[in-house]
Design a protein with these regions (language model features):
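A generic structural signal for short hydrophobic patches within well-formed alpha-helices
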Residues: 159-160
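Conserved non-catalytic scaffold segment of RNase H-like nuclease domains
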Residues: 2-152, 164-186
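Acidic, Mg2+-coordinating catalytic module of metal-dependent nucleases/exonucleases
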Residues: 122-139, 169-239
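Acidic two-metal-ion nuclease catalytic site recognized across multiple nuclease folds
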Residues: 2-33, 198-263
């Protein structure tokens, strides 16, 4: 989700990042999700060097996999080396600096794992347009997503208009209203877990209303039919051991933002 500045940490000296070897140019082969029964939702949060998928880079991934009922199956997180001598972007937001990323894998070295766990699932994010935009740009460039493909998605920020009464749609405000724990804001895994909690809250409200035919249910059908992913299963298993989680928490609390009018 897009950054919202409010936190400043002491400046730390950056050391140049060492570019890693690029990912293979040819798309790997895949015959479907690693586990054909492993379907549901992939709740993702990305921390980035900026706001533009075309010019900025992913520097942290948090992923929480849910079954169709919203129960957590597994999760993982890693820092990502952007692969060039650049800084980490808005340190005051995500709390990361260049030296934090130096020993992390490049996106190409976790792409097969990421795509394997996204495949067959509806991608969920708070402000999905932002996170899915970065995934589309980055994974498409690595040959892991078909050109022009539209990833099936669920946006917990957009759904807040129908399932929340709070006037603000920012993640922290929605979590407070729903009683969902958020942990350290702008730490990718904590934010992904918070978005997963919001999805479960919306599901609960939907059941109470007797409304089962809603956006997140329909998205499962779209995800099952989506065939534009491409990955190497053996590489994905190897990449599981190369993840580098952040050392320490993210930003402890959220900024105050302009209020948004509810629909």
């Amino acid at each position: 989700m897009p950054p919202m500045p409010f936190y400043r940490r002491p400046d730390r000296r950056l050391r140049p990042l060492t570019p890693r070897s690029p990912a293979p140019a040819a798309p790997p082969s895949a015959a479907g999700p690693a586990d054909p029964g492993d379907v549901g939702y992939a709740v993702v949060d990305l921390e980035t060097t900026g706001l533009s998928p075309a010019t900025d880079s992913i520097i942290e991934i948090g992923l929480v996999l849910l079954d169709p009922d919203g129960s957590t199956q597994r999760s993982w997180t890693t820092l990502v080396n952007p692969g060039a001598d650049v800084d980490a972007g808005p340190t005051s937001i995500h709390g990361l600096v260049g030296e934090d990323l130096a020993d992390a894998p490049t996106l190409g070295r976790v792409a097969d794992l990421l795509v394997r766990d996204l495949a067959g699932r509806a991608v969920v994010a708070h402000n999905a347009r932002f996170d899915v935009g970065f995934l589309t740009q980055a994974l498409g460039g690595l040959g892991r997503l078909g050109r022009g493909a539209r990833i099936p998605r669920v946006c917990t920020m957009e759904l807040a208009r129908s399932y929340m009464t709070t006037p603000s749609r920012r993640l922290v405000a929605c979590c407070e209203a729903a009683g969902v724990r958020i942990g350290s804001h702008h730490c990718a895994l904590d934010d992904a877990n918070a978005s997963a909690g919001l999805l479960r809250h919306y599901m609960s409200v939907g059941r109470e209303r007797g409304d089962e035919s809603v956006a997140w249910s329909r998205s499962l059908e779209a995800a099952a039919a989506f065939s534009a992913w491409s990955w190497d299963g053996a590489a994905a298993r190897t990449q599981e051991s190369g993840l580098v989680p952040r050392d320490g928490a993210g930003v402890p609390r959220a900024p105050r933002e302009p209020r948004m009018r509810a629909s």
